[in-house]
Swiss-Prot record:
One GO CC annotation: cytoplasm
Protein name, per record: Ribosomal RNA small subunit methyltransferase F
Active site: C247
Homology family: Belongs to the class I-like SAM-binding methyltransferase superfamily. RsmB/NOP family.
GO molecular function, one term: RNA binding
Keyword Glycoprotein tagged: no
Enzyme Commission number(s) from the entry: 2.1.1.178
Any one GO BP annotation for this protein: rRNA base methylation
Entry's localization field: Cytoplasm
Catalytically driven reaction(s): cytidine(1407) in 16S rRNA + S-adenosyl-L-methionine = 5-methylcytidine(1407) in 16S rRNA + S-adenosyl-L-homocysteine + H(+)
Residues noted as binding S-adenosyl-L-methionine in the record, renumbered to the chain: A125, A126, A127, P128, G129, S130, K131, E149, D176, D194
Stretch forming the signal peptide: none
């Protein structure tokens, strides 16, 4: 890969020289920063096993190199990168993988290390969704995740990625992360705080990332990070795990934030060393047991990860003064829920006891049971998955429910050809040579559900959401 010119402020270089361990070469750091970042993906094991994914993609000639800290993660090299963007491949469109930077897979690996199996998890700064979807896969869509995003424009992207990956156990909120300690004290088994930061580690992806860098800005950001980690720590139950991470390299936003928390609650904070997280983790290990990943160590983005345990309760914060408002949903009664479940099963949609039916007017939703304890404490932007809308003739099943709940071995499943699948993703009706018998057709490609169609004569009426419709060149190579 070609070199590219990264902008470095002099004060930043001075700071890095001081921060870099003696075991690392500063010249190697500069050289690594000038190299473009390696592309990487994470297989979505909610949809496909790693072995099956490797078999499916073997004919493409992709070079997939395993990422040591994530069994589902791979660095990827493709000969036809310019001919077809990775995001336009059939496997990406159907949610079989997520394009995710390798080092950003580290925090979730740390969160679930040593057999940790949390049932209620919060991702404090979740967009665009790489870590939320990784957490959901580790939880196998069980339990519940509260995924929060402060930026309103990024909440839509977060939901789109969660939906594409077939995730059903997530509730979305749109708050400043500093509210949660007071709003939901001691409610979570595990919390990921991938904190907003100065982004010093992303120069391989964005050579101008440091154009507005200054030591003063770092100090302001670190002050916000201290408030965020304090809030997250209050929301964590005693015995729970907190992972703090950034994509920056200075110690003020990293080690110092974690040490501040320990100084503030000396009897409640225990640092959990990460030296055994994966083979070679000790190369990035700090004396506190954190991972301070300079880009030359593993040829990835610069990153920082710390894991800690809350060993005992701490004094509560004052209760919030805001009102959440009335919750507009009501649980569906058992008898009606049974009828809905049977109607859904008839078209290939099934769910387990981790999800419960709720209703708002003509809308039917499935909420993760583990999130119900938070109802009335926070206001949700979106909760669970929308299953259907009711109408006179029955139910209008929703696309996100099909992606999350359908299995390809259903009797209504109908496998499309590559050309027909492209037509589907372009929002067009499909005219198969031999039309299926059923009226409600579970449309699949590569034996993966990609939507639900109505059969009208020999035509499959497209229900792919308009906001997801693709144009341009897709996986068959036709524009």
């Amino acid at each position: 890969m070609a070199q590219h010119t990264v902008y470095f402020p002099d004060a930043f270089l001075t700071q890095m020289r001081e921060a870099m361990p003696s075991t690392l070469s500063f010249d190697d750091f500069l050289a690594a920063c000038q190299r473009p970042l390696r592309r990487s993906i994470r297989v979505n094991t909610l949809k496909i096993s790693v072995a099956d994914f490797l078999q499916l993609t073997a004919p493409y000639g992709w070079t997939l190199t395993p990422i040591p800290w994530c069994e589902e993660g791979f660095w990827i090299e493709r000969d036809n990168e310019d001919a077809l963007p990775l995001g336009s491949t059939a496997e990406h469109l159907s949610g079989l993988f997520y394009i995710q930077e390798a080092s950003s897979m580290l925090p979730v690996a740390a969160l679930f290390a040593d057999g940790n199996a949390p049932q209620r998890v919060m991702d404090v700064a979740a967009a665009p969704g790489s870590k939320t979807t990784q957490i959901a896969a580790r939880m196998n869509n069980e339990g519940a995740i509260l995924a929060n995003e402060f930026s309103a424009s990024r909440v839509k992207v977060l939901h789109a990625n969660i939906s594409r990956c077939g995730i059903s156990n997530v509730a979305l909120t749109h708050f400043d992360g500093r509210v949660f300690g007071a709003a939901v004290p001691e409610m979570f088994d595990a919390i990921l705080l991938d904190a907003p930061c100065s982004g010093e580690g992303v120069v391989r992806k964005d050579p101008d990332a440091l154009k507005n860098w200054s030591p003063e800005s770092n100090q302001e950001i670190a002050a916000t990070q201290r408030e965020l980690i304090d809030s997250a720590f209050h929301a964590l139950r005693p015995g729970g795990t907190l992972v703090y991470s950034t994509c920056t390299l200075n110690q003020e936003e990293n080690e110092a934030v974690c040490l501040w928390l320990k100084e503030t609650y000396p009897d409640a904070v225990e640092f959990l060393p990460l030296g055994d997280l994966f083979p070679g983790a000790n190369k990035a290990l700090t004396e506190e047991g954190f991972l301070h990943v300079f880009p030359q160590i593993y040829d990835c983005e610069g990153f920082f990860v710390a894991r800690l345990r809350k060993t005992q309760a701490i004094p509560a914060l004052p209760a919030p003064k805001y009102k959440v408002g009335n919750f507009p949903f009501s649980p569906v009664k058992d008898r009606e829920a049974g009828q809905i479940r049977q109607a859904a099963a008839d078209v290939g949609l099934n769910w387990d006891e981790n999800l419960r039916l709720w209703q708002r007017d003509k809308e039917l939703w499935l909420f993760p049971v583990g999130i119900e304890a938070l109802i009335g404490k926070v206001r949700f932007s979106r909760l669970g998955i929308k299953l259907a809308e009711t109408h006179n003739k029955g139910y209008r099943w929703q696309h996100e429910a099909v992606i999350a709940l359908a299995t390809p071995d259903n009797v209504n499943a109908f496998e499309l050809t590559p050309q027909e699948a492209e037509e589907w993703y372009r929002g067009r009706d499909v005219y198969p040579q031999a039309a299926p018998v059923a009226d409600d057709v579970l449309v699949t490609f590569q034996h993966q559900p990609i939507g639900l169609a109505k059969r009208i004569g020999s035509r499959l009426k497209n229900s792919y959401p308009r906001e997801l419709v693709r144009d341009g060149k897709l996986f068959t190579g036709n524009a």
